[in-house]
């Protein structure tokens, strides 16, 4: 059973990385909008799942916070995307669907740990892409990123705190 849990958590970790959010790549406004939308769709959905399924109150609280704040972020992003004439999809990307399916299989505190790990990794990637957007030459996206970075950092801190309470990452 322990091996199965480690394999599932490894799959979660692999599904959460965002290699395209590196700082050495020139800023792509459309790419930022699309990637942020995809992440927000998944975070809203996973947040609701965690709010309902979390074993610990901290997991349910983190899920509720992410569900609410990422929903607000996504609504603001959609408005911005419409002004920029960027069509945003309404469905999550395949790896986020796989992440959800993997999390659905996990019981109790194993779910809590997997969710916390996935959120730490996702929010690390979001922080990197939002920093890049905040430093970009696009004034609207820079303002959007600067406005939302504090919320993302708070969410990341809560997820990291929860992960630490649950024994930390199995990879550290």
Language-model segment annotations:
Residues 16-172:
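His/Met- and acidic-residue-enriched segments that coordinate or traffic transition-metal cofactors
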Residues 1-14:
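Sec-dependent bacterial lipoprotein signal peptides
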């Amino acid at each position: 059973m322990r091996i199965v849990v480690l394999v599932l958590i490894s799959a979660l970790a692999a599904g959460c990385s965002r290699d395209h959010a590196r700082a050495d790549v020139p800023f792509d406004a459309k790419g930022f909008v699309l990637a942020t939308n995809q992440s927000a769709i998944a975070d809203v959905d996973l947040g609701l799942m965690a709010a309902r399924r979390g074993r610990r109150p901290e997991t349910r609280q983190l899920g509720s916070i992410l569900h609410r704040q990422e929903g607000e972020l996504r609504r603001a992003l959609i408005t911005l995307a419409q002004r920029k004439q960027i069509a945003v999809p309404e469905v999550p990307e395949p790896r986020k669907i796989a992440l959800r399916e993997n999390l659905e299989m996990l019981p109790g505190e194993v779910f809590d740990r997997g969710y916390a790990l996935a959120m730490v990794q996702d929010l690390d990637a979001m922080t990197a892409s939002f920093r890049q957007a905040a430093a970009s030459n696009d004034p609207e996206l820079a303002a959007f990123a600067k406005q939302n970075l504090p919320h993302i950092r708070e969410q990341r801190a809560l997820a990291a705190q929860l992960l630490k309470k649950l024994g930390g990452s199995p990879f550290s």
